[in-house]
Amino acid sequence: MIQSYKNWINNSYSQIKENYVEINNLDQKLGDGDHGSTILKGLDTAVANLNIISSEDLSFFMSEISKLMRISMGGASGILMTIFIKEIGNINYDNFRLSILDIFSTTIDKIKKRGKVNFRDKSILDIYIPVYDEIFANDVIHINRILDVLDNALESTKNMEANVGRAKFLDTKGIGITDPGAFSTTLILKEFFKEFVNEKNN
C-alpha cells in the first residue's frame, strides 16, 4: 500500500520539477517569486526520505513525510501545502469515495482556518472545493472528470481578484494571472488521482 504513496510523491516531484520555473514566474507577478522552488524543495526532501522512514503504518508514514516537507518549505506554503499530504494517511480503503470526501472536507476546513482564506479568494482552496463537489455529486470517482475539474478550477483562478497574501495588494492587477499555489496543487492532485483511482477503489 505504501508503495503507491511513494509512487505518488515521486510522480508529483517529477511534475513540479518540470514546471517549477513557470510556477516561480507566476509567483513573481503575484507573490514572493519562489513558490515553485519552495514546493520543489519540499518534495525533494520527501523523496529523499521515502525509503528512510521504516514504517508500514500509513498514517505515521504520511505524517512524517508531511512534517519533513513542512519544515523544509517553511512559511505559509509549508503549513498549507502539506495538510492534504498528512490527511491522506487516514484513508479508508473499505469505502474509498467516502473516505476521500472526509479527507477533502478536513483539508478544506484546515486551509480555511490556518490560511484565513475563503472560496474564490484566488488560492489553493479554489482547487480543493471543486474537486470535493465533483466527488460528492457522483457515486463513482471518474478519473477523466476529476482531471477536467482540476484543469477548469485552475483556469478559473486567472479571473479571480486575490484576497489573500501579497497578491491582495495588487487589487485588480492580479486578474488574468494563474495562482501559483493552485498550479502546484493541481499537479499534485492530478498525480494522486492517477495513482489511486480505479474501479476497485470506488
Label every model-predicted segment.
Residues 1-202:
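N-terminal loops that bind phosphate or other acidic moieties
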